[in-house]
Amino acid sequence: MRPSGRTAQQLRPLTFTRHYTKYAEGAVLVEFGETRVLCTATVEEGVPRFLKGQNKGWITAEYSMLPRSTHQRHARESVKGKQGGRTLEIQRLIARALRAAVDLTKLGEFTIKLDCDVLQADGGTRTAAITGACVALQDALQKMRVEGKLKSNPMKGLVAAVSVGVVGGESICDLEYIEDAIAETDMNVVMIEEGAGRKIIEIQGTAEGAPFSHQQLLELLALADDGIKTIFQAQKKVLEK
């Protein structure tokens, strides 16, 4: 039995609050159980130097955790004077995931910056950030269309992510912190919805306590696929409002 009483494949309660702040073109508070991440999308004219003159857009991301988003306070990275390796890894993952879902040639020479700020961390912050950033990005793109900056929606499909892992020899989906801390295997899976199916954008998997078998890998991917299918349904529902 999991600490929350969930079954192996069961997600934590998932909610999206759109337009959470009023200034950004897209602003979404995403909540996976007790994990809460504020995701905003900002549209700026112009692109990085390496894309100038190509009539292509760009998507980038930044990720941070508030000092008391965790059990013990940690100093802001801005005070330390540099970003940590974990932060850089996560924000690059977020950016890669969302770029894979957008036809940058249809974006024009605009840059969309996704800011993902963890308000409270209870496991799965990077997967929550990707999932929430996708909804914020959709809102920003819709606003660009309304303002006449885009002729069509460049989004190829929804993007979502979920954590899976092996805890006590059992494969489970959507790990909370207490599970993640003792997991023998920890994996993050990012997918895009294409038609009625789903395709993998990225997999990050590590044997934390013990190596995992090929069979366990297949079990984890199946759990992730099923969980992300449910997340896509939740994204669609909130975007219809």
Swiss-Prot record:
Group of enzyme by EC: transferase
One GO BP annotation of this record: rRNA processing
Superkingdom of source: Bacteria
EC nos: 2.7.7.56
Pfam family, one: RNase_PH_C
Alphabetical keyword list: Nucleotidyltransferase, RNA-binding, rRNA processing, Transferase, tRNA processing, tRNA-binding
InterPro entries: ExoRNase_PH_dom1, ExoRNase_PH_dom2, ExoRNase_PH_dom2_sf, PNPase/RNase_PH_dom_sf, Ribosomal_Su5_D2-typ_SF, RNase_PH, RNase_PH_bac-type, RNase_PH_CS
Reactions listed under catalytic activity: tRNA(n+1) + phosphate = tRNA(n) + a ribonucleoside 5'-diphosphate
Molecular function via GO: 3'-5'-RNA exonuclease activity; tRNA binding; tRNA nucleotidyltransferase activity
Binding site residues for phosphate: R86, G124, T125, R126
Presence of the UniProt keyword Nucleotidyltransferase in the record: yes
Subunit structure: Homohexameric ring arranged as a trimer of dimers.
Function of the molecule: Phosphorolytic 3'-5' exoribonuclease that plays an important role in tRNA 3'-end maturation. Removes nucleotide residues following the 3'-CCA terminus of tRNAs; can also add nucleotides to the ends of RNA molecules by using nucleoside diphosphates as substrates, but this may not be physiologically important. Probably plays a role in initiation of 16S rRNA degradation (leading to ribosome degradation) during starvation.
Family as reported in the entry's similarity comment: Belongs to the RNase PH family.
NCBIfam families per record: RNasePH
Name of the protein this chain belongs to: Ribonuclease PH
Lineage: Bacteria, Pseudomonadati, Pseudomonadota, Gammaproteobacteria, Enterobacterales
